[in-house]
A protein has these predicted regions:
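Phosphate-coordination/substrate-recognition cap region in phosphate-metabolizing enzymes
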Residues: 1-51
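Alpha-helix N-cap/helix-start capping motif
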Residues: 6-10, 59-60, 88
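Active-site catalytic pocket residues across diverse enzymes, especially alpha/beta-hydrolases
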Residues: 17-20, 69-73
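A glycine-rich beta-strand to alpha-helix segment
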Residues: 52-70
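Domain-level recognition of soluble alpha/beta enzyme cores
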Residues: 73-112
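Short, solvent-exposed coil/turn elements at secondary-structure transition points
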Residues: 31-34, 97, 117
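An N-terminal RHG(E/S)-centered segment typical of histidine phosphatases
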Residues: 49, 63, 101-120
Length: 120
């Protein structure tokens, strides 16, 4: 788990900690950004030994990063929802067949879930 160092992101991590007990949490100042290119650069530097990542960050960087990674998923109702609005505390799950995080920008991801707080 990678998280911004901002208070709201840290508070979000505290809420989900019971569900991710044995998972390392790394707080990164770099994720306190509103720029999707910085987010993409961060993702591309993740070690390839890590196969699954959760990033707690900020908009518009999160929304724009999801849109960049899932751009080929054109028929997706979930993609349309992400394009329309990515509210505070929303969760989006993406999958891909990439083997190297450095290729994340070259390979498109598929949106598996998009959950907004009002749906909970």
């Amino acid at each position: 788990v990678f998280s911004s160092t901002a208070l709201r992101a840290v508070e979000t991590i505290e809420i989900i900690k019971p569900s991710i007990k044995d998972t390392e949490i790394i707080y990164e100042k770099e994720l306190y950004t509103f720029d999707d290119q910085i987010m993409m650069d961060f993702i591309s530097k993740i070690t390839d030994e890590i196969s699954s990542v959760l990033i707690v960050g900020h908009n518009p960087a999160i929304q724009e990063t999801v849109l960049r990674l899932s751009g080929s998923d054109q028929n997706s109702n979930l993609l349309n929802r992400v394009e329309h609005k990515y509210p505070t505390a929303a969760f989006c799950s993406l999958t891909s067949t990439i083997e190297k995080w450095a290729h994340a920008g070259d390979t498109m991801f598929k949106i598996q879930e998009f959950i907004c707080p009002k749906e909970l």
